UniProtKB/Swiss-Prot annotation:
Pfam families cross-referenced by the UniProt entry: Beta-lactamase (PF00144)
Catalytic reactions of this protein: Preferential cleavage: (Ac)2-L-Lys-D-Ala-|-D-Ala. Also transpeptidation of peptidyl-alanyl moieties that are N-acyl substituents of D-alanine
Designated gene of the protein: yfeW
Lipid bilayer topology: Single-pass membrane protein
Protein name: Putative D-alanyl-D-alanine carboxypeptidase
GO BP annotations listed: proteolysis
Keyword Signal carried by entry: no
Entry superkingdom: Bacteria
Keywords, ordered alphabetically: Carboxypeptidase, Cell inner membrane, Cell membrane, Hydrolase, Membrane, Protease, Transmembrane, Transmembrane helix
Length: 432
């Protein structure tokens, strides 16, 4: 009995010695980790000026050396009901959840793929057709090549798919129209390629819709259930979900987006289009109408604290605390620059040349990577400076500047705050 007890203790000690324990985030003052606090806090007045000028809200969090050194919210989670300014708008707080838009691609789809690659359940050189039966060239297709498309081609955005086929809008989509997830995959299979695969990079939502379906094929689970149960829950994330209103959250916890549904202040129309102020539902049309709110390209909601944990996972090389999702080799594989375009990794956007200055500014290291989201979100992860920045906003929660000229430009989008790189540079410029 005594020998057994000793052996058990030794075995437990031996196993614990090999257990991976990753850094977890703690708070620190900016000065403790190399910032000039006075310079950093100059951002406060500038951002408030942007709010006063009409930018709806900004939530900002900065990580340096495993510490949260700045976390603050400005503006309003909801200030309009339709075109009417609320007498008592709802202020944004650091707990406000935001529609991440295309940051979904990284923190749902890419995280899932990185985990599956690490576990050996998928290889990025696998053919797409291995996981999606019937994914092949169609009779009459002018550009061929679907049969040979690999997952890595999809991740690099070189697969040939159009940027935005607008499946839910029958006037635009035509025969590819779909407002049901059950038919959307079939419409994607029928979507003709617009350019020869591998000939250039065209950022496409379709690519990540496909990747979402691949994840569901491998895991035999809906995408939201897979990431919420195998990634977010183990990490202790409380506010990172798809379809938040179906999962216990209420509108006042979430930042509102477009004032008149998806109509761009009344100039866009299609069957079943939403016309009320969007509040707790994903803004993206394909995600909402064609995918039921859960898609590989859009649909995820989160707050700055949860996003900070996910960015720290990347800085840590794949884990957080006692949770390991993937390894540093996988992180390197997915963030490595594409040989054809230095601004693309596997999904991740990389600070590969001056074209990324509006995103990452001019002071972040060339190894910085991250993503943006159409609703006004940015994530920037800098492994050289061991820094990460998340900006969450609800840019579409303002009138359209000139609906008849360009329905996709909102008044808030004309303000300097809409250019993330300026904010990023002020943060880097505050380093001693």
């Amino acid at each position: 009995m005594k020998f057994t007890l000793v052996a058990t203790v030794l075995l437990t000690f031996s196993l614990s010695a090999f257990a991976v324990e990753y850094p977890v985030l703690t708070t620190a003052s900016p000065d403790q980790v190399g910032f000039d606090s006075q310079k950093l806090h100059r951002l406060d007045g500038w951002i408030q000026n942007q709010i006063d000028a009409g930018y709806p809200s900004i939530n900002l969090l900065v990580i340096k050396d495993n510490h949260i050194v700045l976390q603050k919210a400005w503006g309003y989670a909801k200030k309009y009901d339709g075109s009417t300014l609320l007498a008592h708008p709802i202020r944004a707080t650091t707990n406000t959840m935001y529609d991440l838009a295309s940051n979904t691609k990284m923190y749902a789809t890419n995280f899932a793929l990185q985990k599956l690659v690490y576990e050996g359940k998928i290889d990025v050189n696998d053919l797409v057709s291995k996981y999606i039966p019937g994914f092949k060239d169609m009779p009459g297709d002018k550009i061929k090549g679907k049969d040979k498309l690999r997952i890595i081609d999809i991740l690099h955005h070189v697969a040939g798919f159009p940027a935005d086929p607008q499946y839910p809008n029958k006037n635009v989509a035509g025969k590819l129209f779909s407002q049901s997830k059950s038919t959307t995959l079939e419409m994607i299979k029928k979507t003709p390629l617009e350019y020869q695969p591998g000939s250039k990079h065209i950022y496409s939502d379709v690519d990540y819709m496909i990747l979402g379906f691949i994840i569901e094929s491998i895991t035999a689970m809906p995408l939201d259930r897979y990431v919420e149960t195998t990634i977010y829950k183990p990490l202790g994330l409380k506010h990172t979900v798809f379809n938040p209103l179906m999962k216990g959250f209420t509108p006042p916890q979430i930042a509102a987006t477009e004032l008149h549904g998806n109509t761009r202040d009344g100039v866009i129309h299609f069957p079943n289009i939403r016309t009320n102020t969007l509040w707790g539902q994903v803004h993206d049309e394909k995600a909402w109408y064609s995918m039921g709110g859960v898609s590989g390209h859009a649909g995820l909601f989160s707050d700055t604290h949860d996003m900070a944990v996910l960015m720290q996972v990347m800085l840590n090389g794949g884990g957080y605390g006692n949770v390991k999702l993937f390894d540093n080799k996988t992180v390197a594989q997915f963030t490595r620059r594409s040989p054809e375009d230095a601004t693309f990794g596997l999904g991740w956007r990389v600070n590969g040349n001056a074209s990324m200055t509006p995103t990452f500014g001019v002071l972040a290291s060339p190894q910085t990577y991250g993503h943006t989201g159409w609703t006004g979100t940015l994530t920037s992860i800098d492994p050289v400076n061991h820094m990460a920045i998340v900006i969450l906003g609800n840019r579409p929660h303002s009138p359209v500047a000139n609906p008849k000229v360009n329905p996709n430009v909102f008044v808030s989008g004309l303000l300097p705050a809409a250019t993330y790189g300026w904010i990023v540079d002020q943060i880097y410029g505050s380093l001693k």
